[in-house]
C-alpha cells in the first residue's frame, strides 16, 4: 500500500505532510517552501499556474488569478456571503447552471472544487517528488464549521485531483492530534483556529490516546482575508480623500493594495509601525500618483477590532455546549496565521484567563495532524482514537415550515438516528422529505441540503401512515438520509448532494479535464525541453560550421545550412514533434562536419605525437665511453 498523505487545504496557504517513522513531517514544495499559496492563475496563453508562480504574477493578471476560493466552495451564488465576496475580489464570480457560485476567466467557468483540485494536485506532486512514488490517497482537512455541501465539495476536489479521500477531518481536531500525540498530558483543551478565511473553535478532551471533541463552533466567513480587506478599504478611502481617485475601481491597483495590506498586516505582528509605499499606483491628467502612508499597530487594531471581537461569541457557545467554564480549560492551542497577531492573543488570554500555548507552528500543525490521521488509517500510528462531532443540527421540514431536528449539533460521529413521521392530509400517497442543516427554528432559515420523494404510500387517513426517516452521518461528517414506509417496506434514500453541488458526470468530466491538463502540461514541458535542446544544437552547429566549414565539400555544407534554417523556423512555433524531427535532421546532416573535426583532431594529434617521439629518442640516446673520449 502506498503512502497516505495529509493535506491542509487552506484559504490562503496549503500544506502537505506525511508520516516519517513515528512522527509527521511537512514536505517542502518545488520552490523550497513549507506552505504553498492557495492561488491558481490562468495566463494569456492558457497555461495554469499554481502556488507561488501564480501569486507572483497576480498584480499584472488580477482578473485571471483566483485566490480564497475556499470561501466559495459548496456555496450558492445567491448566498449573502458570496454577494459580499463579489465586491472584494478582482476576478469574476458567476452563477453556474446548478445555482452554485463558480469563477470565470476568459469565458471559461471553473467550479470552486475544480480550482481547489488544482491546488490539491500541486500538493500531490510535491509529496510524490519527495517520496519518489505515486500517491493516490489522502486525508484532507476542512473547517470544523463546514456544512455538508462544503464537505462534499471538498471531497469532490480530491477526486478531481486524482486522490481517493480516505477521510475529511476537522482542522481544529487535526491540530489537537498534532499537539497531543507526543504528550502524556490529559485534560481539556480549546483549539482557537483563526486562518485565512475561516474561524473555528473546538473543545476537546485528551487522555490515553483518545481525542474526544466535546463541542465545536465557528464562522466560515471570518479570517485573514477580511483583515486584509479592512486595510485595503482604509488605504483606498485615505487615497480618495487626498487625490479624489477611488483605487477600488482599478483592478490592477486593487491587487497591489491587497498585496501591500497583507504585507503590512504581517509586519505589524512583530513591529509597532510600518510604511506602505506604492509608487505609480495610478495616474490622472496631472500625472502619476503615488501612495505613501505610515500605519501603526494601534491604528490597524482599531480598524479590525470588531473582527477580532467576532471570535468571542463562538468560543462562549462552544464552552456552553461542552458544559464547561473557561477556567476548566487546561490549555488553549493557537492555530492559523492570524493568531500571530498580538491583539488576537490578547483577546484569547482575556477570554480563557490564561496565556495561550504557542508551541505549535500555526501554519503547519493542521497538515501534521492530517498526516497523523492518515497514519492511523494506514495502521502506522497505533492507540489513537479520534471522536469528532457534527457541527450543525440536522433535520427535516415538517408541517408549517418548522425545522424538526433529528440529530443535534455536537453529536459524536459516525452516528445514525431515526424518527417516525406521518402524512399531513387524507389519502396522501407521496411525501417530500426536505433535509436541512442549521440551528434556526424555521426550516427556510437554515441551509437546505437536498430533497427526495417517497412514493406509493397506501391511501389512509392523515396521521395514520408511519414514515421512518433515518439520518446517517459518516466519519467525514457527510450525510445519508433514508425514508421508509413501515406498512409497505418501501424505502427511498439519498446520499445528500447539495441542491447545487457537482453531479457524478460533472466530476468525471473534471477528472478527465485534470488528466488532460496533466497531459497538456507534460506536452508543454516536452516542448520546452525540445526547444532548449534545439537551441543548443543550433548554437553548436553554427560555431562548428564557422570554424570547420571549409573542411567539408559544398554540397554537405549546403545541406547543413538548409537543416539549420528549417530548425530555426520550427523554433518559432511550439510543435515539439516538428522541433524534434528537424533537430534529428540537423544532427544527421552535421555528422560529416563532426567527422571532419575528428579527422583534423586526429591528424593534429599524430603530428604532435611524432614530435614527441623525436624528443624522447634524443633524451634517451646512450653514448659509450669510447665515443665520449674521442669527442
Swiss-Prot record:
Phosphothreonine modified-residue sites: 198
Domain of life: Bacteria
Source species: Rhodopseudomonas sp. (strain No.7)
GO molecular function: ATP binding; ATP-dependent protein folding chaperone; unfolded protein binding
Function: Acts as a chaperone.
Protein name as catalogued: Chaperone protein DnaK
Annotated region (Disordered), positions in chain: 517-536
Family: Belongs to the heat shock protein 70 family.
Gene induction: By stress conditions e.g. heat shock.
Keyword set, alphabetical order: ATP-binding, Chaperone, Nucleotide-binding, Phosphoprotein, Stress response
Cross-referenced SUPFAM superfamilies: Actin-like ATPase domain, Heat shock protein 70kD (HSP70), C-terminal subdomain, Heat shock protein 70kD (HSP70), peptide-binding domain
Gene name of the encoded protein: dnaK
Matching Pfam families: HSP70
